[in-house]
Regions:
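N-terminal Rossmann-like or analogous alpha/beta NTP/dinucleotide-binding catalytic cores
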Residues: 2-87, 94-222
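A short, small-residue-rich loop immediately preceding and capping a beta-strand
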Residues: 87-91, 236-237
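Conserved aromatic-histidine-acidic binding/catalytic patches
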Residues: 98, 238-241, 337
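Short alpha-helical patches at coil-to-helix transitions and adjacent helical residues
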Residues: 103-107, 180, 243-247, 391, ...
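Alpha-helical recognition segments enriched in aromatics with Gly/Pro capping
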Residues: 121-128, 153-168, 172-330, 348-350, ...
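Conserved nucleotide- and phosphate/pyrophosphate-binding catalytic cores
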Residues: 254-475
Length: 475
């Protein structure tokens, strides 16, 4: 049987051959062939890769790895020599009912560790959720009730299943070990930690300076989170880059407990689909939920700005770096249309969550609905001068200036359903669509226009606003 290195190499050779010869990834058997290769890769046994190869495969998708990639390779080597599994910790506080693809980035790495033969411990922070992670917050937040937590937990496991083999993973609640802890035990942990380590955090300093509130519970959040690492004796912890300071506290508390500090693997926080620079977030409406229907996963990713393609391909797919580099090279040389590359991304993510057939059905439906429509060919479209009406909100343009939508309420409902869009078309046939949110609907048109300047200011671009069937051209 071929080893994993040889299998990965053969898989990559086959995929890159398709990329070099495919006339168009938007349709046809070439896209299906690539999706089948990637589906096989998601389940590929990686246990016989060398420790260095394994460490490099993990590091390729991380924003920061501490202490270093060589030390990860050493840990992998030692585990192999001792015939033991590394314990890989990954936790989420159930502060919301939905998980989005931004949360899936460390899950994808966790899957790789599973396929290397290691043990992933998926920790649901039912205790820490009551405190609430203070990272990046500018104000305090009411604690969650037990009912809130149980409601949010209901769909967690179902949503993350595409990324984990739960037959080889533990699914734990940190109340198992945190609820019984005594006050003397907790004080014993705290007395070994300098307060200055927490007060040096920029987010804490900002909140204290502004007088917006910082509870003692929030101050010790990272310490409580560290007790999870101590309990399971974590070798590795996965998390988003925003969790880096919390994970560094985990290393310190583990060392104080006489344990070897865990290796930190921090993944980047991916930008939201709206292309404004804000990170993916349900509150901003610029997210792709793991509970979305196939057509919605596909459609939301197809609406993402072209410039997000490199980031999304590296973070969300099983494509290897040379394959991504080739895709971007072919796109830059116009040998592949950007919409074809975006179709591959959308189909691959839909396939990961819902399966190959669902991805194909979503692609077919999207193509039938959108791909043949060019607004530049639509006759008698009302034109509105942005310089003249830029102070009006997007909603006011449709309701008051153009009179194409009967009310602001209807426009907001359309926006919440994903039907409010900014569409930019170039003379070469390119079309880029940006989904606008309810917030955008209440924002001045000039501000929305400026926020998407990289899209609307391309050479020869014609720009349109669509609300349901209502259409406006912006000049």
């Amino acid at each position: 049987m071929l080893n994993a290195s040889t299998r990965l190499g053969a898989s990559s050779d086959a995929l890159m051959k398709i990329l070099r010869t495919a006339p168009d990834l938007r349709t046809g058997p070439d896209l299906r062939a690539i999706l089948e290769i990637l589906a096989e890769r998601r389940g590929m046994d990686l246990s016989d890769l060398s420790p260095t190869e394994q460490a490099e495969l993990i590091a390729a998708r991380t924003a920061q790895l501490l202490p270093s990639v060589p030390q990860l390779a050493e840990a992998l080597q030692a585990a192999g020599d001792e015939s033991r599994q590394l314990i890989v910790k990954f936790g989420i506080d159930p502060t919301a009912a939905d998980v989005h693809v931004g949360h899936a980035v460390p899950m994808i790495i966790a899957s790789r560790f599973q396929r290397m033969g290691h043990r992933v411990v998926f920790i649901i922070g039912d205790i820490t959720a009551k405190i609430g992670d203070p990272t990046g917050r500018t104000a305090d937040r009411p604690p969650l009730s037990d009912e809130d937590i149980q409601h949010n937990l209901a769909t967690y496991r179902q949503q993350v299943t595409p990324f984990f083999d739960f037959e080889r993973a533990d699914f734990r609640f940190n109340s198992e070990w945190l609820a019984p802890i005594t006050l003397p035990q907790f004080i014993g942990v705290l007395e070994k930690l300098p307060l200055s380590a927490s007060l040096q955090r920029e987010d804490f300093r900002t909140r204290l300076a502004e007088g917006s509130g910082l509870s003692m519970a929030e101050l010790v959040y990272s310490v409580v989170m560290a007790l999870d690492s101590v309990e399971i004796t974590a070798d590795i912890e996965l998390g988003g880059l925003d969790q880096l300071l919390n994970m560094q506290m985990c290393r310190r508390v583990m060392e104080n407990a006489g344990q070897k500090p865990e290796i930190i693997i921090a993944t980047g926080l991916i930008e939201g689909t709206d292309g404004t620079g804000a990170k993916m977030s349900k509150s901003k409406g610029n997210y792709v939920g793991l509970a979305f229907e196939p057509k919605d996963v596909f459609g939301k990713l197809m609406s993402a700005a072209d410039r997000l393609l490199p980031e999304y391909l590296r973070a969300l797919t099983e494509l290897l770096d040379p394959e991504i580099d080739l895709l971007l090279e072919l796109m830059a040389s116009r040998e592949l249309h950007p919409m074809g590359v975006k179709t591959l991304l959308a189909a691959e993510m839909t396939s990961t969550i819902h399966g190959l057939d669902a991805a194909e059905e979503a692609r077919t439906g999207f193509t039938a609905q959108f791909s043949q429509k060019r607004y530049s060919d639509t006759p008698d479209v009302l034109q509105i001068d942005v310089s003249e009406h830029g102070a009006a909100t997007i909603g006011e343009l449709f309701v008051k200036v153009a009179g194409l939508v009967p009310s602001q309420n209807q426009l907001r409902r359309t926006a919440s359903g994903g039907g409010l869009r900014l569409v930019s078309e170039t003379p070469d046939g390119g079309q880029e669509t940006v989904a606008l949110t309810e917030t955008d609907a209440n924002t001045a048109a000039a501000e929305v226009y400026a926020a998407h300047s990289s899209v609307v200011e391309r050479d020869g671009a014609r720009n349109f606003l669509r609300c349901g069937r209502a259409l406006i051209e912006l000049r």
